[in-house]
Swiss-Prot record:
GO terms for molecular function: ATP binding; ligase activity, forming carbon-nitrogen bonds; tRNA binding. Its main location: cytoplasm. It comes from the Bacteria. Its EC number is 6.3.4.-. The keyword tRNA processing applies. This is tRNA(Met) cytidine acetate ligase. It comes from Streptococcus suis (strain 98HAH33). The gene is tmcAL. Catalyzes the formation of N(4)-acetylcytidine (ac(4)C) at the wobble position of elongator tRNA(Met), using acetate and ATP as substrates. First activates an acetate ion to form acetyladenylate (Ac-AMP) and then transfers the acetyl group to tRNA to form ac(4)C34. GO terms for biological process: tRNA modification.
C-alpha cells in the first residue's frame, strides 16, 4: 500500500482541499496546523473540527504541527511538517501549486548545491525580506522567477527543499479555481480567504464547504476576538524583545503603533516595512499574543483523528514513532498547549482544546 502525505491548514476545509485529497493515492496522512496559521492568524474554527472535516472527505490520519512549526516562514513550516510525515513513513508528498514545474528536479538541485545556496542567501543585503531572499536564491540557481502572488508555488519550492535527502517523492497537483489571495468565487472552487470573509453567507458556505453543517455549528473566531488581549500583552510586557523572533526594532515599532490603532489590520499596516512583510509582522504579533519563546520541538506526534484504516496504520508504526493520543498531566508540547489555552479565550463557547481530548474517529 502506498502512503501519501499532505501538508495543510484547512482554514477552513473547502472543495479545493477535497479535490487534492481525491488526487492522493493509498493511505492518506495529513499533517495540519493547529489553532494558529502559518501567516500569523487564528484558525476560523478549531483544529478538532477541521480534522473531522478532512476525515469525512478522504483523509485516513490527521496529525498536528507543533505551534513553532505551524506559525513560521515557508521553509521552516515545510521542513517541520515534512519531518513529521517522514517519521510516519510517507512515500509521496501531494500538494497544490499554481505552477506545474518539475519540483523533483528542483529538489535535486538543492541536494547538490544546498550549502552554496544557503551561503548565497546569507550574503544577500540585510534589507531584503525573507521572501525576496528566497526568490533571489531560486532565480540564481534554478532560473525561476516568481512573485508573492503565488504562495502555493512558494510553499512548493519550500517542500522541494524540505524533502531533500528524505526519499519522499513530490507529486504536484494543479491548483483549481480561485487564487490563494482571491476574494472571488467560481463555479466549483473558492479560496479559503473568500470563504472566511463570507463565513456568514449560508449559500457560499454550502456551495464550497463539503462539511458545511460542521462549519455552521462550530464556534468561529478571527483576530478581532484576540485584539484586546494582544493590546494588553504589548502594553504590559516588560521586554518584547524576549518574545520569539522579536528584535529591538520590531518591538519599538509595535509599541509605538499600538496606542493609535483599533484593529490588528491597522497595527500590521503601521508596523510593516519593506524589510518586515505583513506575513512576518502577523506572525510576530501571534508570538506576542501567545508570549512564545523558543522551545525544542516535541519528539512525539500528536494525533488529531483517524479513519479505521488510519487507526490500523497507527498500530503498525507505534513501536517506532512516539504517538500522543490524549494529553493529560504530561504535556505533549508546552508551547502548543499554551497557544491552545489562548485560543480558547477567543469565545466563551469555545470547546476545550487540549486536556482530555481524544482523536476524532470517522468510519
Amino acid at each position: 500500500m502506498s502512503i501519501s502525505g499532505i501538508i495543510a491548514e484547512y482554514n477552513p476545509f473547502h472543495t479545493g482541499h477535497k479535490y487534492l485529497l481525491e488526487q492522493a493515492e493509498g493511505l492518506k496522512i495529513v499533517v495540519m496546523s493547529g489553532n494558529f496559521m502559518q501567516r500569523g492568524e487564528p484558525a476560523i474554527v478549531d483544529k478538532w473540527t477541521r480534522a473531522q472535516m478532512a476525515l469525512e472527505h478522504g483523509a485516513d490520519l490527521v496529525v498536528e504541527m507543533p505551534f513553532l512549526v505551524s506559525v513560521q516562514s515557508a521553509d521552516h513550516f515545510a521542513k517541520g511538517a515534512i519531518s513529521i510525515l517522514h517519521r510516519l513513513g510517507v512515500e509521496k508528498l501531494v500538494f497544490g501549486t499554481e505552477e506545474m514545474l518539475d519540483y523533483q528536479k528542483i529538489a535535486d538541485i538543492y541536494v547538490d548545491k544546498s550549502e552554496e545556496m544557503e551561503n548565497f542567501v546569507k550574503n544577500l543585503p540585510d534589507n531584503f525580506s525573507y521572501p525576496q531572499k528566497t526568490q533571489a536564491m531560486w532565480q540564481e540557481f534554478a532560473g525561476l522567477t516568481f512573485t508573492g502572488d503565488t504562495p502555493n508555488h512558494i510553499l512548493a519550492l519550500a517542500y522541494a527543499k524540505g524533502v531533500a535527502g528524505t526519499g519522499i517523492q513530490l507529486s504536484p497537483v494543479q491548483r483549481q479555481g480561485a487564487g490563494f489571495h482571491s476574494e472571488e468565487v467560481e463555479t466549483s472552487y473558492a479560496s479559503a480567504i473568500a470563504i472566511r470573509k463570507g463565513a456568514d453567507q449560508l449559500d457560499l458556505v454550502r456551495d464550497f464547504l463539503p462539511s458545511a453543517s460542521l462549519f455552521e455549528e462550530a464556534t468561529k473566531v478571527s483576530w478581532r476576538n484576540y485584539f484586546p488581549l494582544l493590546r494588553y500583552q504589548i502594553t504590559t510586557h516588560p521586554d518584547l524583545s524576549q518574545v520569539f523572533q522579536v528584535n529591538e526594532e520590531l518591538a519599538s515599532r509595535i509599541r509605538s503603533a499600538i496606542g493609535s490603532v483599533a484593529t490588528v489590520e491597522e497595527l500590521v499596516e503601521a508596523v510593516t516595512t519593506k524589510r518586515y512583510t505583513k506575513a512576518r509582522v502577523r506572525r510576530v504579533l501571534t508570538y506576542i499574543l501567545i508570549n512564545a519563546v523558543e522551545t525544542p520541538l516535541p519528539d512525539a506526534v500528536h494525533v488529531l483523528g483517524f479513519s479505521a484504516r488510519g487507526q490500523a496504520y497507527l498500530k503498525q508504526v507505534k513501536e517506532r514513532v512516539g504517538l500522543v493520543t490524549r494529553i493529560g498531566k504530561e504535556p505533549w508540547d508546552s508551547l502548543t498547549q499554551q497557544a491552545d489555552l489562548v485560543y480558547q479565550l477567543g469565545a466563551d463557547a469555545m470547546a476545550e482544546q487540549t486536556y482530555g481530548r481524544v482523536p476524532v474517529r470517522v468510519e
